[in-house]
Every structure is written in C-alpha cells, then in structure tokens.
Amino acid sequence: MSSPYSTSETTSFGFRKVPIESKKALVRDVFNSVANNYDLMSFGVHRLWKASLLDWLSPHPDKVLLDVAGGTGDIASRYKRRGGGPVIVCDINQAMLEAGRSKLSEYGKLSDITWVCGDAESLPIPDRSIDAYTIAFGLRNVTSISKALKEARRVLRPGGRFMCLEFSHPAISAIIPAYNAYSFKILPEIGRLVTKDRDAYKYLVESIRKFPNQKELEKCMKSVNLEKTSYRNLSGGIATIHSAWRL
C-alpha cells in the first residue's frame, strides 16, 4: 500500500507538493528551526498526552523500547522514570537529538539510553530486536507512512507493541472553529515572534491536516500486518494514540 501522502513523483509537504527526494531535507530544516521551541505546538498539553501514552504502554524493566522521532527525550525519560528497561532514541534530526540529550543530561537521566541518528523509513536497528516501538508526533513527517510502519513491524519481536501518538482530526465538531483559528492564525504568529520562523510552524499545522484520520491510519497499520489495532482520542481528537501488535 502506498503512503497516503505520495504519488510516484511527488509528496505532500504541508499543503505543497514537492519532489519525494526533497521532503526529508525540508522536514529536517523545519526541525532545525523549531528544535528548542516545539512545545508551542500544543502549549504544553503534549505532556499530558505523553503521560497517557505511557499509561497505556505500561513500561516494564525487561522490555527494550525504541522511541522513533524521539529526539526531545521526553518519551525516553518518562519510560525510565516509570521503571522501563533500556531505551534507544532514534531521530533523523541531529539537532533534535542534541537538544534532547542535553536536556536529559542536566537532570542526570541518561542512564541506559542510547541515542541514534536514523530514518524511520530505514531504521539502523536489527530485525526482531525491540519489545516496544513508540513514535510521538513524528509519523506525519515521514515521506512514506507505509515504509515507516513496515520498519516498525520489522524491528519488533513477535509479541512486540507499536504505539503512535500524533496530532489528529477533532472528533467533536464544537471545538473545530477554535482549533482552526489557533492552528492557522495564532500558532504561526507565535512561531514568528518566538523563533522568527513563521513558515516552519505553518508547515507543522498543514502537516497535521494532511495526515490520515484515525480510521485511515488504522487501515494503514493493518495493511502492513500490524494486528489488534485500536486507538484512543485525546482532547476531543486533537491528538490520538494508536496501538497495534506484531503477533
């Protein structure tokens, strides 16, 4: 199954169509710009959403976690605080990795955490070596969702769990006008004032709108043989946690 984003020649970069081969560099530039101010995307509510992700995952000291697009270190540190086992943090963006590692080092939280610069669509991780795979706010930025999901399944051991936390599509119609106003008018202006880069935040908003809705992403997961799929909407569907297993 091809990615919901792409054709054979172009793919979506926000609302723009760009050559497939250029998207990774464009996304990298965005995250180089926003690495230290990514909290603006949710006004900090992402912390509650990540707590919900970890609640559902239930960390275990014998389970190895791979956190993809995890350069901020948030999921890794939360997993360790809750008694989880070793963590591999993988991110395509070196600036995000450095920001995350620096943040965790200040609090002495680097024990048993490995940092790897790598691509979600071609992970530098052996087959069947991971107990749990998480990706928080990263799947919508890949060029091919299908390739990223296939890679997730490849690295999971049988019985391993896939979990994705991502901005999604509001399920409550009453919140949509306010959500649209914040997304398209307020957030890009905050980005301009704080980071001097309005376009980076504009892309992030557009990437959310181009991302498959909850049911569509569930179909993508099933298409690569991830099984027992389910999801939970957070904040009325502004964000969603998806869960699946390699059986």
Question: For each of these PLM feature ranges, what is it?
Answer:
Residues M1-R28:
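N-terminal auxiliary segments of SAM/dcSAM-dependent transferases
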Residues V18, S22, L165, H169-C220, ...:
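C-terminal alpha-helical "lid/dimerization" subdomain adjacent to the S-adenosyl-L-methionine
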Residues G44-K63:
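Conserved alpha-helix/loop element of class I SAM-dependent methyltransferases that forms part
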Residues V64-S122:
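Class I SAM-dependent methyltransferase SAM/SAH-binding core
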Residues E121-Y133:
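A short acidic, Gly/Pro-enriched loop at the edge of an enzyme's catalytic core
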Residues D131-I145:
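A short SAM/SAH-binding and catalytic strip from SAM-dependent methyltransferases
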Residues S146-P158:
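A short glycine-rich, Lys/Arg-flanked "PGG" loop and its adjoining helix->strand segment in the class I
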Residues E218, V224-L247:
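Core SAM-dependent methyltransferase catalytic element
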